[in-house]
């Protein structure tokens, strides 16, 4: 059977950036991976409707517990609030939750945690698969017909200027006894082309008939169209 690789992981270092920036000893690698995963999950669960596409975590010093978090989101006000102290409150809450995370797992606390937090807006939010998937999940959970929801998702993406998109829904569609998959595709989606700027997201939708699996691939154009430094 054919094996499918993750579209973003397939292009790391080519057209996709890494989401974590740090280098440490093998003893600390496992700990830093755990707390980075915890912070990402906590932020995404707390701000479900904010349209968070990805979160970058940076660490500069091996011996220091300081870290920087950069959130890329479609709706900044939902995260930062109306005043300038919204980010400060979130920053304090993240430090507190991280300390609780260490205590619950009997991990060695690194000392005073210095956390820098920033939020960056997205130029065209509906050109990102994560934002489109969140909206599609919301519509399906509100019992909108899945074919109409898929078509509207494609239309929103095309209006945002994407070159191509594929939307797939799997599960008991319309309450059918046998699960199946249906997809809608518009434009090219070259998954095997490394220079293609492909964005991908997969999410579950909890409906009255059970879970539906949602996958969205977005093709935003090609990068690395020429190589000028090779002779």
Swiss-Prot record:
Domain KH type-2 residue range list: 39-123
Single GO MF descriptor: structural constituent of ribosome
Biological processes annotated in GO: translation
Primary site of residence: plastid
Locations listed in the record: Plastid, Chloroplast
One term under GO cellular component: cytosolic small ribosomal subunit
Protein name, as recorded: Small ribosomal subunit protein uS3c
Xref: NCBIfam families: rpsC_bact
Keywords for this protein: Chloroplast, Plastid, Ribonucleoprotein, Ribosomal protein, RNA-binding, rRNA-binding
Species in which this protein is naturally found: Chlorella vulgaris (Green alga)
């Amino acid at each position: 059977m054919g094996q499918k690789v993750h579209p973003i992981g397939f292009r790391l270092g080519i057209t996709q950036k890494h989401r974590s920036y740090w280098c440490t000893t093998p003893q600390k690698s496992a700990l830093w991976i755990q707390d980075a995963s915890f912070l990402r999950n906590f932020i995404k669960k707390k701000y479900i409707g904010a349209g968070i596409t990805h979160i970058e975590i940076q660490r500069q010093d091996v011996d220091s517990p300081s870290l920087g978090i950069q959130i890329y989101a479609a709706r900044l006000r939902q995260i930062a609030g109306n005043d300038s102290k919204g980010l400060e409150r979130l920053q304090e809450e993240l430090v507190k939750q991280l300390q609780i995370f260490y205590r619950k797992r009997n991990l060695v606390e690194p000392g005073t945690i210095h956390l820098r937090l920033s939020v960056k807006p997205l130029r065209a939010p509906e050109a990102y698969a994560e934002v489109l998937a969140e909206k599609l999940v919301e519509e399906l959970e509100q019992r909108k017909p899945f074919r109409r929801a898929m078509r509207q998702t494609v239309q929103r993406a095309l209006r945002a200027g994407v070159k191509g998109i594929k939307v797939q829904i799997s599960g008991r569609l319309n309450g059918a006894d046998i699960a199946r998959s249906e997809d809608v595709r518009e434009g090219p989606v070259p998954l095997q082309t490394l220079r293609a700027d492909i964005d991908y997201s997969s999410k579950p939708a909890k409906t009255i008939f059970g879970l539906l699996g949602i996958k969205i691939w977005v093709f935003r154009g090609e990068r690395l169209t020429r190589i000028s430094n090779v002779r």
